Amino acid sequence: MRSATIKRKTKETDIEVAVNLDGTGVVNIATGIGFFDHMLDLLARHSRIDMTVKAVGDLHIDFHHTTEDVGIALGQAVRQALGDMAGITRYASIHMPMDETLTRVVIDVSGRPMLVFRTTFPRDKIGEFDTELVREWFNAFAMNAGITLHVETLYGENAHHIAESCFKGLARALRSALAIDPRNQGEVPSTKGQLGG
């Protein structure tokens, strides 16, 4: 089973994350940030990754540390659960609609971290959640999962819909890219014979 648990404690946050890449999208999320919990719930359910996220952070300051540190821990958990990445599909691309919004997400599970994030929001906040934290989370996740990730919102007007299309797009791209391709017969999908080097 491709699964991992990560515990990460700093002076700012105390986080425990568990993932099962071969799950059915079972979710247990509690970060203390309602909108962020909603986005992580979407990520788990649409990727079919079983996901537990427990986070206690310095929310009296703002949501930045908790959001970023959850991205770090989730990325580390996915990377650990992947092991040597043998048999994975590796690449995926999705166009994700959310009402008037359309976002393209392209992923390469390469072991080489990179984020290209071309998404803007029409306002600074969704409820109490700073929209700039969407990019912060995606960056933390991509860097620690070791994936190349391109996120581009082609058009959209509603900030909630834009954020949701980004998270759902990532979910469906992960679902495809992390899937085991039986034609790979357990081989690492790289001419180098390994990923990440």
From Swiss-Prot:
What keywords appear on the UniProt entry?
Amino-acid biosynthesis, Cytoplasm, Histidine biosynthesis, Lyase
Pathway assignment: Amino-acid biosynthesis; L-histidine biosynthesis; L-histidine from 5-phospho-alpha-D-ribose 1-diphosphate: step 6/9
- Gene Ontology BP term (one): L-histidine biosynthetic process
Q: Which GO terms describe its cellular component?
A: cytoplasm
Chief location: cytoplasm
Q: Report the catalytic activity.
A: D-erythro-1-(imidazol-4-yl)glycerol 3-phosphate = 3-(imidazol-4-yl)-2-oxopropyl phosphate + H2O
- Molecular function (GO) terms listed? imidazoleglycerol-phosphate dehydratase activity
Which compartment or compartments is the protein found in? Cytoplasm
Q: What is its EC number?
A: 4.2.1.19
**Known Pfam families for this protein?**
IGPD (PF00475)
- What protein family is recorded? Belongs to the imidazoleglycerol-phosphate dehydratase family.
Q: Please give the NCBIfam families that the UniProt record associates with this protein.
A: PRK00951.1-5, PRK00951.2-1, PRK00951.2-4
Name it. Answer: Imidazoleglycerol-phosphate dehydratase
Q: Which species is this record about?
A: Bradyrhizobium sp. (strain BTAi1 / ATCC BAA-1182)
